[in-house]
Every structure is written in structure tokens, then in C-alpha cells.
Amino acid sequence: MTIEQLARSTRSVFELHYESLTGLPFFTSFPLNCCQGASVVFGMLVKLLSTQHTVTVVKGDTRDRRESHYWLEIDGLVYDLTLDQFQETLGNRFDGIDTPLYGATKHPLRMHFFYKERHSAVLAFCIFCQKHANTEEVDAALQFVRSKLANLKPSEIELPMATAKLRTKRTITEIRRGKCHVPEL
């Protein structure tokens, strides 16, 4: 499965099961205000693949820092599973924001979300769990999404359940033991 296929499948799971993802803040209104949770979960899914990818979670802020948005850069390409949330408010000023973004070279809102902060997928997961959500609930949501992805097309999913669960548990254990340093933002 390619990263683009995984992104599209993950978005489908989010659309179909957003009401079940209560461990992710704001997911009952998906895609509105769900960018951080969606980016963190998708970033961890990519990190759990058997192939190696450079995954960066990007937080962009407006110039006045009143609005922010999260997306991913994976191997130099942009993935934004919640970009379409801006169609109603920014669609008259920016093109290409009516659907999610899968593997673009540039983010269409790069000039709107001007100031950018970048973190690895694992650090972004740690920050999200420590500052915005409950670690166990986020892990449960991640495992739920993984199980739904496996049910979509089992032959294409490259997420070995035992190995991926072990890696996720190790990250959660590091968070609990305080070994996952979260910088002050």
C-alpha cells in the first residue's frame, strides 16, 4: 500500500467512524477542528509501516497567531486529511482546498498558515497526548483506526498488528515514565 492509499483509506475510516473516535478531541465534528488528532494518528500509522519514511507533523499559524492548522509532510510531500474544513471559510481566497490533500508538493494554505513548527511523528504524538488528550484514549483510537484499515483491504495493509502494537505501547510507556520530552511551546 502506498502512502497515498493509506492516507485515502485513513480519511475513509475517519469519515465512516468519527463518532467512535471519542478519544480524539473534536472528532465528533470531523473534519472541523480535527487536524491535530488526524495528523497525529496518520503520522503514527505511517511510522508503524514496515518501510521507512520521514514523517513530520507541521503546525502552521496565521500571522496574527489566532488560527492554527496541522498537516503532515511525508518524504517531502504534503498530506492534509482535513484540508476541506476550510472550503467554506477560505474557499473564495484559495484554490484546491475543497478536498483532502494527498501527496502534494506544496500546501495550498502555506501563505495563510505562515509560521510553521515541525515535529517528528512520535514527538507530535507525545505532545498531543500530554497536552491535549488522554494517552490511553488516543492509543485506543489509533488501534481502532488500524483495525478498521485492516478490514478495508487486508491484503494491502502493511501494518503487522503485533509489531505495531508493541511500538505504540513502547511510546506510551515512554510518555508515562517521562522519557518523552515535550518542549514548551
Range-by-range predicted roles:
Residues 1-185:
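A structural boundary/capping signal
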